[in-house]
From Swiss-Prot:
This is Chaperonin GroEL. Belongs to the chaperonin (HSP60) family. GO terms for molecular function: ATP binding; ATP-dependent protein folding chaperone; isomerase activity; unfolded protein binding. Its EC number is 5.6.1.7. It is found in: Cytoplasm. InterPro entries: Chaperonin_Cpn60_CS, Cpn60/GroEL, Cpn60/GroEL/TCP-1, GroEL-like_apical_dom_sf, GROEL-like_equatorial_sf, TCP-1-like_intermed_sf.
């Protein structure tokens, strides 16, 4: 086991604080409408220019192991806030730094860390309650535009995100992809889309666009491989008699079966398109079941004791239209029973709540969106790749912020909500004594910090701005972009309640952990051994 280095009390806390400050000072320059960018070196490719707190925090590793621990504690604040609320990471970092700074001053002056921690917790509970009381419900597209614009620092992005949210509703999924052009555009996909295209190009109905469009088709859904035409011949005969079209979704269609379908299509006997089933393994079964419920059909599977040769037309799904492209299939207006679709949506929502894996959650959200609201794709365009990546991060933040706003509502932005919570905190402080009171005072001081930082990033004196907002009526804050004092709700400067609440809770949690630290243990770096001397030349 490697030897360890240990630091105690004041020395340990100071080392942690240096790390906290190095990370927080790097992150906080990005706060507010006049916040600057940070350039991150990349091992491969061009450097990344970002304005996103958590992305910067994740890149920071310090050489000194003790300082690095302090930095990692605050990094945890940023990433936890990002996981829960998706935005507000810089605010959380600024709050944590302020609480740690004030707390360490008081501990150095003789305060008891454990009692300070109790005071901090009581104060945060009061602040969170106050933030919830201030919260207003999101009303309509305009509020969403405000939230997205503030989060991304760009009105165009705000409008785009609001359009996307309006089209796909809360259960829909909005994905962000890189565009081939310099334009940033929004594409709405109606109905259920999955990433599998036609098995054979001979199946297309529109040769110019290279896509197959089937109006009012039957849909055969199976998890089997179809190799011989005998398997589906009885079914095909019934469909030809009715003069209908057919979409086959199967594990694969190959050999003689595929050849027969293509020949019949070319002769005009039967218009049929075959696509492979989406997903893999258990996820494929679930997705096929989703398609079956959406179209009112049944998954023909041996597990259910169903045989392809005995399939009746009543077991097939129906849809108003199916569009099959080279790599995508879109089912529009499935004929499924609305109550069954609703039940399926509820079941997926429950799975989303219970899953612990981020990957599974993302896939479940996609399935939910396809069943419920549809899918919107924002194609991000920019002149250079560096700018595109930066823009993509900002759009992702804006999306997370709008979802958080729809969930829990909005509060005045620009650090105003924290300042407006101070009077409620003052009432609590009057009831506390000793170090508990000091703990609550630490939180009170920290609440001013986001606004002070926004003002300083705009090149103004933070303390003057903070005092002016404190003296103003509730809801009046500082518009740093236009350098004026306004009613934040009216000016459209708002933050999601969830983001504001999460930022203060996570910051306090990390600060409390760090302030109650008495010893720090790190691994001693091994000294590099000198290489052996080269052997003398032999003659």
């Amino acid at each position: 086991m490697a030897a360890k280095m240990i630091l105690f009390d004041e020395e340990a806390r100071r080392a942690l604080e240096r790390g906290v400050n190095k990370l927080a000072d790097t992150v906080k320059v990005t706060l507010g409408p006049k916040g600057r960018n940070v350039v991150l070196e990349k091992k491969f490719g061009s450097p990344q220019i970002v304005n996103d707190g958590v992305t910067i925090a994740k890149e920071i590793e310090l050489e000194d192991p003790f300082e690095n621990m302090g930095a990692q504690i605050v990094r945890e604040v940023a990433s936890k806030t990002n996981d829960i609320a998706g935005d507000g990471t810089t605010t959380a970092t600024v709050l944590a730094q302020a609480m740690i700074r004030e707390g360490l001053k008081n501990i150095a002056a003789g305060a008891n860390p454990m009692i300070l921690r109790r005071g901090i917790q009581k104060a945060v509970d009061v602040v969170v309650d106050e933030i919830k009381k201030m919260s207003k419900k999101v009303r309509g597209k305009e509020d969403i535009t405000y939230v997205a614009s503030i989060s991304a620092g760009d009105e165009e992005i705000g409008k785009l995100v609001a359009d996307a949210m309006e089209k796909v509703t809360n259960d829909g999924v909005i994905t962000v992809e890189e565009s081939k052009t310099t334009e940033t555009t929004l594409e709405i996909v109606e109905g259920m889309q999955f990433d599998r295209g036609y098995i054979s190009a001979y199946m297309v109905t529109d040769t110019e666009r290279m896509e197959a469009v089937l109006d009012d088709p039957y849909i055969l859904i199976t998890d089997k491989k179809i190799s011989t035409i005998q398997d589906i011949l009885p079914l095909l005969e019934q469909i030809v008699q009715q003069g209908k079209k057919l979409l086959i979704i199967a594990e694969d269609v190959e050999g003689e079966a595929l050849a027969t379908l293509v020949v019949n299509k070319l002769r005009g006997t039967l218009q049929c398109v075959a696509v492979k089933a989406p997903g893999f393994g258990d996820r494929r079964k679930a997705m096929l079941q989703d398609i079956a419920i959406l179209t009112g059909g049944q998954v023909i599977s041996e597990e259910l004791g169903l045989d392809l040769r005995e399939v009746k037309i009543s077991q097939l799904g129906r849809a108003r239209q199916v569009k099959v492209q080279k790599e995508n299939t879109i089912i529009v207006d499935g004929a499924g029973d609305p109550s069954e679709i609703k039940a399926r949506i509820q079941s997926i929502k429950k799975q989303i709540e219970e899953t612990t894996s981020d990957f599974d959650r993302e896939k479940l959200q996609e399935r939910l969106a396809k069943l419920a609201g549809g899918v919107a794709v924002i194609h991000v365009g920019a002149a250079t790749e560096t700018e595109m990546k930066e823009k993509k991060l900002r759009i992702e933040d804006a999306l997370a912020a709008t979802k958080a706003a729809v969930e829990e509502g909005i509060v005045p932005g620009g650090g105003t909500a924290f300042i407006n919570a101070i009077p409620a905190l003052d009432k609590l402080i009057e009831t506390l004594t000793g170090d508990e009171k000091t703990g609550a005072m630490i939180v009170k001081k920290a609440l001013e910090e986001p606004l002070r930082q926004i003002a300083e990033n705009a090149g103004l004196d933070g303390s003057v701005i903070v005092n002016k907002v404190k003296e103003s009526p509730a809801g009046i804050g500082f518009d740093a972009l236009n350098e004026r004092f306004v009613d934040m709700f009216e000016a459209g400067i708002v933050d999601p309640t969830k983001v504001t609440r999460t930022a203060i809770q996570n910051a306090a949690s990390a600060a409390a952990m760090l302030l109650t630290t008495e010893a720090v243990v790190a691994e001693k770096p091994e000294k590099e051994k000198n290489p052996p001397a080269p052997a003398p030349d032999m003659y």
